[in-house]
């Protein structure tokens, strides 16, 4: 089967949020274009070099998302629209894309990514820019998480600053396994990665083997009993709220928890749900997304 492009035209105020939601829900890549390009209504977004742009998207924007063959465009778009508060699913088109085009596009667009103080995420077709750094070798794939998205970056920066050797870590919603692998490379042991998607679990296992990281992965029913020193969950705000009691119960008293996949405007609502269990606040914000971090109280 061929890869597909989902093409949606919508107003500027929804374009960026929809792009982020599509990525969170499994799109391989997303771009925002001027829907009026090459017409009399075309609007330059950026002005003179060195000047800060007045806008970050066009008034009439086109969102183009690349989808793997197993994703149903209509279902994905409806879920993304619901996530950002659009009641009616926008009109859309679907275009077929040859698989070999995607492979070439991947290798031309993905470069090594520096994160935090000493982390590099490096595709397999690149050499590590700094062999002495903390290197994670990951290729873009069907499972979310290559370090390029703000939520992944935020969680990685938090883990780099938080994990101490020998601590136990639970990565709930592990996707590609990038956070679990990083935790293990920072000295955490044991590290458990959980995801609802069997394909993500298999991808995470393969990525851990490639990175020589001893991490145990499984579906939610395989999540071990007991508590962890650190719990990290980079998913979406609604699932985070629904799973608050369960996730908080996985943190040892005095242990740490980090939550992302949360837009800045959703932070207070998510924090309010978790405040029943943990002392939590916004740790850091990046490009409109936040990482919430907190400590479980000794009793609740």
Swiss-Prot record:
Its main location: cytoplasm. Its EC number is 2.1.1.-. It is found in: Cytoplasm. One of its GO terms (biological process) is methylation. Gene3D superfamilies: Vaccinia Virus protein VP39 (3.40.50.150). GO terms for molecular function: protein-lysine N-methyltransferase activity. It comes from the Bacteria. This is Ribosomal protein L11 methyltransferase. It comes from Burkholderia vietnamiensis (strain G4 / LMG 22486). The gene is prmA.
């Amino acid at each position: 089967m061929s890869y597909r492009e989902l093409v949606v035209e919508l107003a500027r105020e929804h374009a960026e949020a929809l792009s982020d939601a599509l990525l969170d829900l499994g799109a391989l890549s997303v771009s925002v274009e001027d829907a009026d390009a090459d017409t009399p209504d075309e609007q330059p977004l950026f002005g003179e070099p060195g000047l800060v742009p007045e806008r970050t998207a066009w008034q009439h924007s086109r969102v183009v998302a690349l989808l793997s063959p197993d994703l149903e465009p209509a279902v994905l778009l409806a879920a993304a629209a619901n996530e950002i508060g659009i009641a009616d699913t926008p009109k859309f088109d679907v275009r077929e894309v040859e698989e070999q085009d995607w492979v070439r596009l991947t290798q031309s667009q993905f470069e090594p990514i520096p994160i935090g103080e000493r982390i590099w995420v490096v595709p397999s077709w690149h050499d590590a820019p700094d062999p002495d750094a903390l290197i994670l070798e990951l290729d873009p794939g069907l499972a979310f998480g290559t370090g390029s998205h703000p939520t992944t970056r935020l969680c990685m920066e938090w883990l780099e600053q938080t994990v101490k050797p020998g601590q136990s870590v639970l990565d709930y919603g592990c996707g590609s396994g990038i956070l679990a692998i990083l935790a293990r490379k920072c000295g955490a042991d044991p590290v458990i990665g959980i995801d609802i998607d069997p394909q993500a679990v298999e991808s995470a296992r393969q990525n851990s083997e490639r990175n020589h990281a001893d991490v145990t992965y499984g579906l939610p029913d395989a999540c071990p009993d007991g508590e962890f020193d650190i719990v990290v969950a980079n998913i979406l705000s609604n699932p985070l709220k629904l799973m608050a009691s369960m996730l908080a119960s996985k943190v040892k008293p005095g242990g740490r928890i980090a939550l992302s996949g949360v837009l800045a405007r959703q932070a207070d609502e998510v924090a309010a749900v978790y405040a029943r269990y943990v002392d939590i606040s916004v740790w850091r914000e990046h490009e409109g997304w936040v990482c919430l971090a907190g400590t479980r109280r000794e009793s609740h």
